[in-house]
Protein backbone atom coordinates (compact mmCIF):
# COMPACT_ATOMS: atom_id res chain seq x y z
CA UNK A 1 0.00 0.00 0.00
CA UNK A 2 1.26 3.50 -0.85
CA UNK A 3 2.02 6.23 1.68
CA UNK A 4 2.33 10.01 1.73
CA UNK A 5 5.01 11.76 3.79
CA UNK A 6 4.05 14.96 5.56
CA UNK A 7 6.63 17.15 7.28
CA UNK A 8 5.66 19.79 9.84
CA UNK A 9 8.33 22.28 10.93
CA UNK A 10 7.13 24.40 13.83
CA UNK A 11 9.09 26.80 15.99
CA UNK A 12 9.87 24.10 18.57
CA UNK A 13 9.59 20.74 16.81
CA UNK A 14 10.10 19.18 13.39
CA UNK A 15 7.97 16.13 12.66
CA UNK A 16 7.88 13.60 9.85
CA UNK A 17 4.72 11.51 9.54
CA UNK A 18 3.86 8.64 7.19
CA UNK A 19 0.18 8.39 6.27
CA UNK A 20 -1.77 5.75 4.43
CA UNK A 21 -4.00 7.21 1.74
CA UNK A 22 -6.99 7.11 4.11
CA UNK A 23 -5.16 9.35 6.61
CA UNK A 24 -4.11 6.57 8.98
CA UNK A 25 -0.83 7.41 10.73
CA UNK A 26 1.71 4.66 10.11
CA UNK A 27 4.83 6.23 11.61
CA UNK A 28 5.79 9.43 13.41
CA UNK A 29 9.20 10.81 14.33
CA UNK A 30 10.22 14.18 15.65
CA UNK A 31 13.31 16.21 16.32
CA UNK A 32 13.30 19.04 18.83
CA UNK A 33 14.85 22.25 17.62
CA UNK A 34 17.02 24.53 19.70
CA UNK A 35 16.18 28.22 19.66
CA UNK A 36 19.24 30.47 19.87
CA UNK A 37 18.67 33.70 21.80
CA UNK A 38 21.90 35.71 21.50
CA UNK A 39 20.10 38.86 22.72
CA UNK A 40 16.78 39.61 24.42
CA UNK A 41 14.00 39.44 21.87
CA UNK A 42 16.01 37.33 19.42
CA UNK A 43 14.83 33.83 18.44
CA UNK A 44 17.00 32.16 15.80
CA UNK A 45 17.39 28.70 14.37
CA UNK A 46 20.20 28.23 11.85
CA UNK A 47 19.05 26.98 8.45
CA UNK A 48 21.45 24.05 8.78
CA UNK A 49 19.75 23.05 12.04
CA UNK A 50 16.36 23.02 10.32
CA UNK A 51 17.63 20.72 7.59
CA UNK A 52 19.44 18.47 10.05
CA UNK A 53 16.23 18.18 12.08
CA UNK A 54 14.31 17.25 8.93
CA UNK A 55 16.76 14.54 7.89
CA UNK A 56 16.83 13.12 11.42
CA UNK A 57 13.04 13.02 11.63
CA UNK A 58 12.57 11.48 8.17
CA UNK A 59 15.17 8.76 8.75
CA UNK A 60 13.64 7.86 12.11
CA UNK A 61 10.15 7.83 10.60
CA UNK A 62 11.11 5.58 7.68
CA UNK A 63 12.97 3.23 10.04
CA UNK A 64 9.63 2.44 11.69
CA UNK A 65 8.20 1.25 8.36
CA UNK A 66 11.02 -0.13 6.18
CA UNK A 67 8.59 -1.35 3.51
CA UNK A 68 6.93 2.05 3.06
CA UNK A 69 6.13 3.04 -0.53
CA UNK A 70 6.23 6.82 -0.36
CA UNK A 71 4.68 8.33 -3.48
CA UNK A 72 4.90 12.06 -2.66
CA UNK A 73 6.21 14.49 -0.05
CA UNK A 74 4.76 17.74 1.26
CA UNK A 75 6.04 20.13 3.91
CA UNK A 76 4.30 22.59 6.20
CA UNK A 77 6.21 25.15 8.19
CA UNK A 78 5.65 27.98 10.62
CA UNK A 79 4.83 31.18 8.84
CA UNK A 80 6.69 34.46 8.96
CA UNK A 81 10.13 34.65 10.48
CA UNK A 82 12.88 34.67 7.85
CA UNK A 83 15.18 32.02 6.41
CA UNK A 84 17.82 33.33 4.02
CA UNK A 85 20.28 31.67 1.66
CA UNK A 86 23.17 33.46 0.01
CA UNK A 87 23.63 33.77 -3.75
CA UNK A 88 25.23 30.31 -3.87
CA UNK A 89 22.17 28.89 -2.07
CA UNK A 90 24.18 28.30 1.09
CA UNK A 91 22.54 28.88 4.52
CA UNK A 92 22.84 32.42 5.83
CA UNK A 93 20.42 33.16 8.70
CA UNK A 94 17.26 31.69 10.22
CA UNK A 95 14.87 33.77 12.35
CA UNK A 96 11.79 32.26 13.97
CA UNK A 97 8.31 33.74 14.17
CA UNK A 98 8.56 34.46 17.90
CA UNK A 99 11.46 36.90 17.36
CA UNK A 100 10.69 40.48 18.44
CA UNK A 101 13.86 42.38 17.50
CA UNK A 102 12.00 44.36 14.83
CA UNK A 103 9.27 45.69 17.14
CA UNK A 104 10.56 49.24 16.76
CA UNK A 105 10.46 48.91 12.97
CA UNK A 106 6.85 47.68 13.09
CA UNK A 107 5.96 50.60 15.34
CA UNK A 108 7.64 53.03 12.93
CA UNK A 109 5.59 51.66 10.02
CA UNK A 110 2.44 52.23 12.08
CA UNK A 111 3.41 55.78 13.04
CA UNK A 112 4.32 56.85 9.51
CA UNK A 113 1.10 55.53 8.02
CA UNK A 114 2.90 52.94 5.91
CA UNK A 115 1.18 50.13 7.83
CA UNK A 116 -2.25 51.24 6.63
CA UNK A 117 -1.04 51.32 3.03
CA UNK A 118 0.56 47.90 3.50
CA UNK A 119 -2.70 46.46 4.83
CA UNK A 120 -4.61 47.87 1.87
CA UNK A 121 -2.46 45.71 -0.41
CA UNK A 122 -1.41 42.71 1.70
CA UNK A 123 -4.37 42.37 4.12
CA UNK A 124 -1.71 41.72 6.75
CA UNK A 125 -1.01 43.82 9.81
CA UNK A 126 2.63 44.71 10.35
CA UNK A 127 4.25 43.08 13.37
CA UNK A 128 7.71 42.33 14.63
CA UNK A 129 8.17 38.80 13.26
CA UNK A 130 6.60 39.21 9.84
CA UNK A 131 9.04 38.39 7.07
CA UNK A 132 9.22 41.80 5.33
CA UNK A 133 9.44 43.69 8.65
CA UNK A 134 12.37 41.51 9.72
CA UNK A 135 13.98 41.91 6.30
CA UNK A 136 13.61 45.67 6.53
CA UNK A 137 15.15 45.61 10.02
CA UNK A 138 18.12 43.56 8.78
CA UNK A 139 18.62 45.98 5.92
CA UNK A 140 19.09 48.78 8.46
CA UNK A 141 20.81 47.02 11.34
CA UNK A 142 22.78 44.21 9.67
CA UNK A 143 23.58 45.50 6.18
CA UNK A 144 26.42 43.00 5.74
CA UNK A 145 23.99 40.11 6.12
CA UNK A 146 21.42 41.82 3.91
CA UNK A 147 23.93 42.35 1.11
CA UNK A 148 24.87 38.66 1.09
CA UNK A 149 21.28 37.46 0.65
CA UNK A 150 20.32 35.63 -2.50
CA UNK A 151 17.01 34.08 -1.45
CA UNK A 152 14.51 34.90 1.31
CA UNK A 153 12.36 31.90 2.19
CA UNK A 154 9.81 30.69 4.71
CA UNK A 155 10.47 27.67 6.93
CA UNK A 156 8.83 25.04 4.71
CA UNK A 157 10.55 26.49 1.61
CA UNK A 158 13.91 25.62 3.17
CA UNK A 159 12.76 22.01 3.51
CA UNK A 160 11.43 21.88 -0.04
CA UNK A 161 14.70 23.35 -1.32
CA UNK A 162 16.97 20.85 0.40
CA UNK A 163 14.73 17.94 -0.63
CA UNK A 164 14.38 18.94 -4.28
CA UNK A 165 17.14 21.44 -5.00
CA UNK A 166 14.51 23.95 -6.15
CA UNK A 167 13.83 27.49 -4.92
CA UNK A 168 10.08 27.87 -4.50
CA UNK A 169 7.37 29.44 -2.39
CA UNK A 170 3.61 29.16 -2.21
CA UNK A 171 0.68 31.56 -2.02
CA UNK A 172 -0.41 30.59 1.50
CA UNK A 173 2.94 31.54 3.05
CA UNK A 174 3.43 34.61 0.86
CA UNK A 175 0.00 35.93 1.83
CA UNK A 176 0.38 35.02 5.50
CA UNK A 177 3.74 36.75 5.76
CA UNK A 178 2.59 40.03 4.22
CA UNK A 179 4.55 39.62 1.00
CA UNK A 180 1.63 39.08 -1.38
CA UNK A 181 -0.27 41.96 -2.92
CA UNK A 182 -3.86 40.72 -3.14
CA UNK A 183 -4.58 43.29 -5.85
CA UNK A 184 -2.37 41.35 -8.26
CA UNK A 185 -2.32 38.01 -6.39
CA UNK A 186 1.45 38.04 -6.30
CA UNK A 187 4.44 40.20 -5.46
CA UNK A 188 4.43 43.87 -6.38
CA UNK A 189 7.04 46.60 -6.47
CA UNK A 190 4.55 48.95 -4.81
CA UNK A 191 4.09 46.72 -1.76
CA UNK A 192 7.81 46.07 -1.35
CA UNK A 193 8.52 49.80 -1.55
CA UNK A 194 6.18 50.42 1.39
CA UNK A 195 8.49 48.26 3.51
CA UNK A 196 11.51 50.15 2.06
CA UNK A 197 12.42 46.92 0.26
CA UNK A 198 12.16 47.94 -3.39
CA UNK A 199 15.60 46.41 -3.96
CA UNK A 200 14.60 43.07 -2.39
CA UNK A 201 11.95 41.91 -4.86
CA UNK A 202 14.34 39.52 -6.64
CA UNK A 203 15.17 37.80 -3.33
CA UNK A 204 11.68 36.30 -3.16
CA UNK A 205 10.96 32.80 -4.52
CA UNK A 206 8.64 31.98 -7.44
CA UNK A 207 5.08 31.37 -6.19
CA UNK A 208 3.12 28.16 -6.71
CA UNK A 209 -0.12 26.63 -5.51
CA UNK A 210 0.49 24.58 -2.36
CA UNK A 211 -0.30 21.33 -4.21
CA UNK A 212 1.91 22.00 -7.25
CA UNK A 213 4.78 19.59 -7.80
CA UNK A 214 7.94 21.73 -7.85
CA UNK A 215 10.65 19.06 -7.96
CA UNK A 216 11.77 15.57 -7.02
CA UNK A 217 13.90 14.11 -4.25
CA UNK A 218 17.53 14.64 -5.27
CA UNK A 219 20.26 12.03 -5.00
CA UNK A 220 21.82 13.93 -2.10
CA UNK A 221 18.52 14.25 -0.24
CA UNK A 222 17.85 10.56 -0.83
CA UNK A 223 21.20 9.67 0.71
CA UNK A 224 20.58 11.86 3.77
CA UNK A 225 16.94 10.94 4.42
CA UNK A 226 16.45 7.41 3.10
CA UNK A 227 13.72 8.54 0.70
CA UNK A 228 13.97 7.10 -2.84
CA UNK A 229 15.37 9.50 -5.41
CA UNK A 230 12.82 10.97 -7.80
CA UNK A 231 9.74 11.07 -5.54
CA UNK A 232 7.64 14.20 -6.30
CA UNK A 233 7.84 17.12 -3.85
CA UNK A 234 5.06 19.71 -3.75
CA UNK A 235 5.46 23.41 -2.95
CA UNK A 236 4.02 22.94 0.53
CA UNK A 237 1.83 25.03 2.78
CA UNK A 238 1.77 27.54 5.65
CA UNK A 239 1.34 25.43 8.81
CA UNK A 240 -1.64 27.46 10.01
CA UNK A 241 -3.55 26.59 6.84
CA UNK A 242 -2.14 23.05 6.88
CA UNK A 243 -3.64 22.46 10.32
CA UNK A 244 -7.02 23.61 9.04
CA UNK A 245 -6.78 21.23 6.07
CA UNK A 246 -5.66 18.39 8.35
CA UNK A 247 -8.70 19.11 10.55
CA UNK A 248 -11.08 18.96 7.62
CA UNK A 249 -11.67 22.71 7.42
CA UNK A 250 -11.61 23.70 3.74
CA UNK A 251 -15.13 24.91 2.88
CA UNK A 252 -16.43 28.48 3.12
CA UNK A 253 -17.83 29.25 6.57
CA UNK A 254 -15.97 26.49 8.40
CA UNK A 255 -13.75 27.46 11.35
CA UNK A 256 -10.51 26.05 12.72
CA UNK A 257 -8.87 26.68 16.09
CA UNK A 258 -5.25 25.59 16.51
CA UNK A 259 -3.88 25.65 20.04
CA UNK A 260 -0.14 25.12 19.71
CA UNK A 261 2.77 27.56 19.95
CA UNK A 262 0.40 30.10 18.43
CA UNK A 263 -3.24 30.82 19.12
CA UNK A 264 -4.68 30.34 15.63
CA UNK A 265 -8.32 31.17 14.97
CA UNK A 266 -9.44 31.09 11.35
CA UNK A 267 -12.46 31.00 9.06
CA UNK A 268 -12.60 29.99 5.39
CA UNK A 269 -13.97 32.83 3.23
CA UNK A 270 -14.77 33.15 -0.46
CA UNK A 271 -12.79 36.34 -0.93
CA UNK A 272 -10.60 38.70 1.11
CA UNK A 273 -12.21 41.88 2.40
CA UNK A 274 -10.15 45.05 2.76
CA UNK A 275 -12.61 46.45 5.31
CA UNK A 276 -12.18 43.64 7.83
CA UNK A 277 -9.78 44.86 10.54
CA UNK A 278 -8.25 41.44 11.23
CA UNK A 279 -4.68 40.30 11.73
CA UNK A 280 -4.00 38.20 8.65
CA UNK A 281 -5.45 36.80 5.44
CA UNK A 282 -4.00 33.75 3.70
CA UNK A 283 -4.83 31.59 0.70
CA UNK A 284 -6.16 28.05 0.94
CA UNK A 285 -6.91 27.34 -2.75
CA UNK A 286 -7.42 29.40 -5.89
CA UNK A 287 -10.99 30.30 -4.95
CA UNK A 288 -10.81 30.33 -1.15
CA UNK A 289 -9.04 32.35 1.51
CA UNK A 290 -8.42 32.08 5.22
CA UNK A 291 -9.29 34.99 7.52
CA UNK A 292 -7.01 34.64 10.54
CA UNK A 293 -6.66 36.11 14.02
CA UNK A 294 -3.54 34.87 15.78
CA UNK A 295 -0.78 35.52 18.31
CA UNK A 296 1.91 33.56 20.16
CA UNK A 297 -0.30 33.07 23.22
CA UNK A 298 -1.38 29.43 23.21
CA UNK A 299 -0.31 26.02 24.51
CA UNK A 300 3.42 26.82 24.43
CA UNK A 301 2.74 28.55 27.76
CA UNK A 302 2.06 25.12 29.26
CA UNK A 303 5.29 23.73 27.78
CA UNK A 304 7.17 26.52 29.57
CA UNK A 305 5.40 25.97 32.89
CA UNK A 306 5.96 22.22 32.88
CA UNK A 307 9.61 22.64 31.87
CA UNK A 308 10.48 25.31 34.43
CA UNK A 309 8.39 23.99 37.32
CA UNK A 310 8.75 20.24 36.86
CA UNK A 311 6.82 18.02 39.25
CA UNK A 312 8.85 14.89 38.65
CA UNK A 313 6.24 13.19 36.48
CA UNK A 314 6.92 12.06 32.93
CA UNK A 315 4.72 12.29 29.85
CA UNK A 316 3.16 14.97 27.67
CA UNK A 317 2.59 18.25 29.51
CA UNK A 318 -1.05 18.60 28.50
CA UNK A 319 -1.82 15.01 29.45
CA UNK A 320 -0.16 15.02 32.85
CA UNK A 321 -1.49 18.45 33.82
CA UNK A 322 -5.09 17.65 33.00
CA UNK A 323 -5.70 15.47 36.05
CA UNK A 324 -4.64 18.35 38.31
CA UNK A 325 -6.78 20.90 36.50
CA UNK A 326 -9.76 18.54 36.62
CA UNK A 327 -9.61 18.63 40.43
CA UNK A 328 -10.08 22.41 40.59
CA UNK A 329 -13.59 23.53 41.47
CA UNK A 330 -15.03 26.77 40.04
CA UNK A 331 -14.19 29.58 42.43
CA UNK A 332 -14.24 33.33 41.84
CA UNK A 333 -10.99 33.63 43.83
CA UNK A 334 -8.94 31.46 41.49
CA UNK A 335 -5.93 33.27 39.99
CA UNK A 336 -5.83 34.59 36.44
CA UNK A 337 -3.04 34.28 33.88
CA UNK A 338 -1.97 36.43 30.94
CA UNK A 339 -0.34 34.08 28.35
CA UNK A 340 2.11 36.62 26.93
CA UNK A 341 5.41 34.77 27.39
CA UNK A 342 6.24 35.41 23.75
CA UNK A 343 4.78 38.91 23.58
CA UNK A 344 1.15 38.66 22.53
CA UNK A 345 -1.70 40.33 20.76
CA UNK A 346 -0.84 43.76 22.19
CA UNK A 347 2.46 43.93 20.32
CA UNK A 348 5.89 43.60 21.91
CA UNK A 349 5.39 45.20 25.36
CA UNK A 350 2.86 42.66 26.70
CA UNK A 351 4.22 40.26 29.33
CA UNK A 352 2.94 37.09 30.95
CA UNK A 353 1.84 37.01 34.55
CA UNK A 354 -0.25 35.33 37.23
CA UNK A 355 -2.65 37.61 39.09
CA UNK A 356 -4.54 37.17 42.34
CA UNK A 357 -2.32 34.49 43.85
CA UNK A 358 -2.77 33.75 47.56
CA UNK A 359 -0.96 31.46 49.98
CA UNK A 360 -3.59 28.74 49.71
CA UNK A 361 -3.39 28.44 45.95
CA UNK A 362 -1.80 25.28 44.60
CA UNK A 363 0.02 24.11 41.50
CA UNK A 364 -3.34 22.83 40.26
CA UNK A 365 -4.89 26.30 40.68
CA UNK A 366 -2.05 27.88 38.70
CA UNK A 367 -2.42 25.30 35.94
CA UNK A 368 -6.16 25.97 35.82
CA UNK A 369 -5.41 29.68 35.42
CA UNK A 370 -2.96 28.90 32.62
CA UNK A 371 -5.40 26.64 30.77
CA UNK A 372 -8.11 29.27 31.15
CA UNK A 373 -5.84 32.20 30.21
CA UNK A 374 -4.77 30.52 26.98
CA UNK A 375 -8.42 29.84 26.16
CA UNK A 376 -9.26 33.48 26.95
CA UNK A 377 -6.58 34.59 24.46
CA UNK A 378 -8.30 32.47 21.80
CA UNK A 379 -11.64 34.06 22.74
CA UNK A 380 -10.18 37.56 22.30
CA UNK A 381 -9.20 36.67 18.73
CA UNK A 382 -12.56 35.06 18.01
CA UNK A 383 -14.32 38.16 19.33
CA UNK A 384 -12.38 40.19 16.75
CA UNK A 385 -13.40 37.79 13.98
CA UNK A 386 -17.02 38.17 15.08
CA UNK A 387 -16.70 41.95 15.17
CA UNK A 388 -15.43 41.79 11.58
CA UNK A 389 -18.58 39.97 10.51
CA UNK A 390 -16.99 36.51 10.56
CA UNK A 391 -19.12 34.84 13.21
CA UNK A 392 -19.32 31.05 13.29
CA UNK A 393 -21.44 28.66 15.32
CA UNK A 394 -18.97 25.79 15.79
CA UNK A 395 -15.28 25.05 15.27
CA UNK A 396 -12.79 22.21 14.92
CA UNK A 397 -9.93 22.17 17.44
CA UNK A 398 -6.43 20.84 16.81
CA UNK A 399 -2.96 21.34 18.26
CA UNK A 400 -1.30 20.53 21.57
CA UNK A 401 -4.38 21.36 23.66
CA UNK A 402 -6.22 18.37 22.18
CA UNK A 403 -3.82 16.04 24.01
CA UNK A 404 -5.51 17.12 27.24
CA UNK A 405 -8.58 15.29 28.45
CA UNK A 406 -10.27 18.49 29.64
CA UNK A 407 -8.89 21.45 27.68
CA UNK A 408 -11.12 20.94 24.59
CA UNK A 409 -14.21 21.06 26.84
CA UNK A 410 -12.90 24.30 28.37
CA UNK A 411 -12.72 25.76 24.85
CA UNK A 412 -16.39 24.88 24.33
CA UNK A 413 -17.33 26.38 27.71
CA UNK A 414 -15.34 29.61 27.32
CA UNK A 415 -16.29 30.22 23.68
CA UNK A 416 -19.89 29.12 24.12
CA UNK A 417 -19.91 27.07 20.90
CA UNK A 418 -19.77 23.34 20.05
CA UNK A 419 -16.24 22.05 19.49
CA UNK A 420 -15.17 19.07 17.42
CA UNK A 421 -11.71 17.58 17.79
CA UNK A 422 -9.59 16.19 14.97
CA UNK A 423 -8.69 12.55 15.64
CA UNK A 424 -5.26 12.94 14.05
CA UNK A 425 -2.86 14.67 16.42
CA UNK A 426 -0.53 15.61 13.55
CA UNK A 427 -2.90 17.83 11.57
CA UNK A 428 -0.16 20.07 10.16
CA UNK A 429 1.70 17.11 8.69
CA UNK A 430 -1.59 15.62 7.45
CA UNK A 431 -2.48 18.88 5.71
CA UNK A 432 0.90 18.85 3.97
CA UNK A 433 0.46 15.20 3.02
CA UNK A 434 -2.99 15.89 1.55
CA UNK A 435 -1.39 18.65 -0.57
CA UNK A 436 1.13 16.08 -1.78
CA UNK A 437 -1.68 13.66 -2.63
CA UNK A 438 -3.50 16.30 -4.66
CA UNK A 439 -0.23 17.17 -6.38
CA UNK A 440 0.27 13.66 -7.72
CA UNK A 441 -3.35 13.22 -8.77
CA UNK A 442 -4.73 11.07 -5.96
CA UNK A 443 -7.51 13.60 -5.46
CA UNK A 444 -8.72 16.46 -7.67
CA UNK A 445 -8.67 19.04 -4.88
CA UNK A 446 -8.25 19.55 -1.14
CA UNK A 447 -11.94 19.00 -0.43
CA UNK A 448 -11.83 15.48 -1.84
CA UNK A 449 -8.52 14.81 -0.09
CA UNK A 450 -10.11 15.85 3.20
CA UNK A 451 -13.13 13.61 2.55
CA UNK A 452 -10.81 10.64 2.10
CA UNK A 453 -8.13 11.29 4.72
CA UNK A 454 -9.52 13.35 7.64
CA UNK A 455 -11.44 11.89 10.57
CA UNK A 456 -13.04 13.81 13.43
CA UNK A 457 -13.91 12.51 16.88
CA UNK A 458 -17.58 11.50 16.62
CA UNK A 459 -18.38 13.25 19.90
CA UNK A 460 -19.15 16.97 19.61
CA UNK A 461 -18.32 18.85 22.82
CA UNK A 462 -21.25 21.06 23.77
CA UNK A 463 -20.70 24.14 25.97
CA UNK A 464 -21.81 23.77 29.58
CA UNK A 465 -24.04 26.74 30.44
CA UNK A 466 -22.99 26.85 34.10
CA UNK A 467 -19.30 26.74 33.21
CA UNK A 468 -19.78 29.41 30.54
CA UNK A 469 -21.46 31.61 33.17
CA UNK A 470 -18.46 31.02 35.47
CA UNK A 471 -15.81 31.86 32.85
CA UNK A 472 -17.56 34.89 31.34
CA UNK A 473 -17.02 37.40 34.20
CA UNK A 474 -13.49 36.08 34.64
CA UNK A 475 -12.83 36.83 30.97
CA UNK A 476 -14.01 40.40 31.51
CA UNK A 477 -11.64 40.70 34.49
CA UNK A 478 -8.85 39.21 32.36
CA UNK A 479 -9.41 42.01 29.84
CA UNK A 480 -9.57 44.71 32.55
CA UNK A 481 -6.25 43.50 33.96
CA UNK A 482 -4.75 43.65 30.49
CA UNK A 483 -5.90 47.24 30.10
CA UNK A 484 -4.56 48.15 33.55
CA UNK A 485 -1.16 46.59 32.79
CA UNK A 486 -0.83 48.18 29.37
CA UNK A 487 0.77 51.43 30.55
CA UNK A 488 3.23 49.53 32.75
CA UNK A 489 4.24 47.24 29.88
CA UNK A 490 4.89 50.24 27.65
CA UNK A 491 6.80 52.02 30.43
CA UNK A 492 9.02 48.97 30.85
CA UNK A 493 9.71 48.95 27.10
CA UNK A 494 10.57 52.65 27.12
CA UNK A 495 12.92 52.15 30.08
CA UNK A 496 14.67 49.31 28.24
CA UNK A 497 15.09 51.46 25.14
CA UNK A 498 16.61 54.28 27.20
CA UNK A 499 19.00 51.81 28.87
CA UNK A 500 20.11 50.42 25.49
CA UNK A 501 20.75 53.92 24.16
Locate the predicted segments by residue.
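Short acidic-aromatic active-site loops that bind/stabilize oxyanions
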Residues: 43-51, 124, 128, 207-211, ...
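Short beta-strand-loop/turn "lid" adjacent to the catalytic site in phosphate-handling enzymes
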Residues: 59-97, 125-129, 160-181, 206-211
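Structured loop/turn residues at beta-strand edges in well-structured enzyme cores
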Residues: 68, 202, 390
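Active-site core segments that coordinate phosphate-bearing ligands/cofactors
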Residues: 5-6, 103, 110-122, 133-168, ...
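Residue-level signal for inorganic ion chemistry
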Residues: 23, 46, 73, 99, ...
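N-terminal glycine/serine-rich phosphate-binding loop of ATP-dependent small-molecule kinases
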Residues: 1-95, 120, 148, 222-223, ...
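Short linear loop/turn motifs
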Residues: 202-212, 319-322
Amino acid sequence: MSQLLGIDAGNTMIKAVLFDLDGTVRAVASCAGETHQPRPGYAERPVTDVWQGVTTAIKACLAQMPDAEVIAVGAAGHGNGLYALDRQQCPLIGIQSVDSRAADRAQELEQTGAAAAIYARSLQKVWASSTPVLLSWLKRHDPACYQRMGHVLCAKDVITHFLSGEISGDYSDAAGSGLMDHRVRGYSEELMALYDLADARLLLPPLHQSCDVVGQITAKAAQLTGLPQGIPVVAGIFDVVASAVGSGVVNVGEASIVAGTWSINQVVVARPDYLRPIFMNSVIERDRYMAIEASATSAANLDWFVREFADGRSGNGAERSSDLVAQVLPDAHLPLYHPYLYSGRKEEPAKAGFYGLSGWHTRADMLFALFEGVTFAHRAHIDRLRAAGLAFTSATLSGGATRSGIWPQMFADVLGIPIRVAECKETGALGAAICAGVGVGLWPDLAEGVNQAVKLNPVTLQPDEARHAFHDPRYKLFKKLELAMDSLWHQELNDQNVTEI
